[in-house]
Design a protein with these regions (language model features):
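Hydrophobic alpha-helix feature that most strongly marks membrane-spanning transmembrane helices
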Residues: 27, 82, 86, 122-125, ...
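A short glycine-rich beta-alpha junction/loop motif
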Residues: 84, 98-105, 135-161
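Sequence-specific dsDNA recognition surfaces
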Residues: 20-29, 44-73
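A short beta-sheet element
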Residues: 77-121
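Short, surface-exposed loop/turn microsegments at beta-strand edges and helix-strand junctions
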Residues: 32-38, 56, 69-71, 90-102
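Non-catalytic DNA-recognition/assembly elements of restriction-modification systems
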Residues: 1-32, 156-197
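A structural connector/turn signal
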Residues: 65-66, 94, 137
């Protein structure tokens, strides 16, 4: 139950705060210029590890009407849709100034580093708090007001630093494995094209 998960956080020895006091949400609407090209991130582009797996590059006139939020490096985007709350990602420098769907909350914090924020959003405790704050009948979602009420643990700085270090290491390794996979694919294609010679 919501009370049980909230109780866990409220008894965390490092303390806690309401989301509204710990995090900031960028809700500013940005209207893309019709003839400018943009990088657009939507729900389907979010990987299971809190990474962005793909994006759409398109002119403003070709983007959907929900493409209205600008994101910056180290923002964390969190899906507001009930069935996809686990879809959250850390914005890397590669996606600085990209646009994301209004189906995401764009979050940052001065008290919690981005990697820890991402880890919190993906944790079982926070996922359950988010789920239980959703409303709606056909398509449930969490709204801004309910999100602001959720309690967030204040993680100690040394723990945050360790989390950040581990997340950054995993990003480097993931990028390296992606590069190795691409190289392997090229080698296989070359072998096929040359008839195995």
């Amino acid at each position: 139950r919501y009370e049980d998960y909230a109780h866990l956080i409220e008894h965390y020895r490092g303390g806690y705060g309401q989301f509204s006091n710990v995090c900031m949400i960028n809700e500013a609407n940005y209207v893309p210029a019709a003839n400018e090209k943009y990088t657009y991130i939507e729900l389907g582009n979010i990987g299971s590890y809190g990474n962005i797996t793909d994006c759409t590059v398109a002119y403003g006139k070709d983007l959907p009407s929900r493409a209205r939020r600008v994101v910056h490096t180290n923002n964390v985007i969190l899906s507001s849709v009930g069935g996809s709350l686990q879809s959250c990602a850390l914005i890397s420098s590669e996606y600085d100034n990209a646009i994301c769907s209004t189906g995401f909350f764009v979050v940052r914090s001065n008290a919690i580093n981005s990697e820890t924020l991402l880890t919190l959003f993906k944790s079982e405790v926070m996922q359950n708090l988010l789920k239980q704050s959703c409303s709606g009948t056909i398509l449930t979602a969490i709204n801004h007001t309910e999100l602001q009420k959720i309690v967030v643990p204040k993680i100690r700085k040394e723990v945050q630093d360790k989390i950040a270090e581990n997340i950054q290491k995993s990003i480097v390794l993931r990028n390296k494995s992606k590069s190795l996979l691409e190289n392997a694919k090229v080698q296989v294609e070359n072998v096929i094209q040359t008839g195995g010679v």
